[in-house]
Regions:
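C-terminal beta-strand-loop-alpha-helix "lid" module of Rossmann-like NAD(P)-dependent dehydrogenases
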Residues: 1-171
Length: 173
């Protein structure tokens, strides 16, 4: 998926594509494709910490806010279940408000939620509240992606070890 995504942006030129690989293998893949990683985040993949995730998220948000980049895309393994880890590509910035609205519209408790939405007085204002909370939500998203990817890696390793153990027990001697 990394290669496919890089092909989508190939018209921009390699020097205009900034990659922040998390993990040793991803960093090696980025280098092999001829790109220069924008930092080393190898340890973050093994033991994700909120502090490191916060720093990475702040850096990505600053690049976007400063118009250094026009979008940020996250590619990671989403842990669906022990037997299923899905490689996921997700737009991080700019926020896709239409997609968020669709998710809310599809929520099974939408009617029940709507009755509560009109009962709140927000101070100082909705805009200020969103401006305060949005960076925190974006930082939490990076941390969640790191945790998700870490869980996927552990699940894949466990399945591989179980399969190898089964092969040991079933091989003819």
């Amino acid at each position: 998926m990394l290669e496919h995504t890089l092909e989508e942006y190939s018209t921009l030129g390699k020097e205009n594509i900034l990659l922040y690989p998390v993990g040793k293998k991803v960093e090696e893949a980025v280098r092999k494709l001829g790109y220069t990683p924008q930092g080393s985040y190898q340890d973050m993949a093994d033991k994700p910490s909120y502090t490191e995730a916060y720093q990475l998220a702040e850096q990505l948000m600053a690049l976007y806010a400063g118009k250094t980049v026009d979008r940020v895309v996250l590619i990671y393994h989403h842990f669906k279940s022990m037997g299923s880890q899905v490689l996921t590509k997700e737009n991080y910035l700019p926020l896709d408000l239409e997609q968020m609205a669709m998710q809310v519209a599809m929520h099974p408790d939408k009617k029940e939620m709507a009755s509560y939405n009109n009962d709140y007085i927000v101070e100082p204002s909705v805009g200020e509240l969103i401006a305060e909370l949005l960076p925190k939500v974006l930082c939490q998203k990076v941390f969640t992606v790191l945790q998700d990817s870490n869980a996927s890696e552990h699940a894949a390793r466990m399945l591989a070890m179980q399969a190898a153990t089964c092969l040991l027990y079933t091989s003819p001697s």
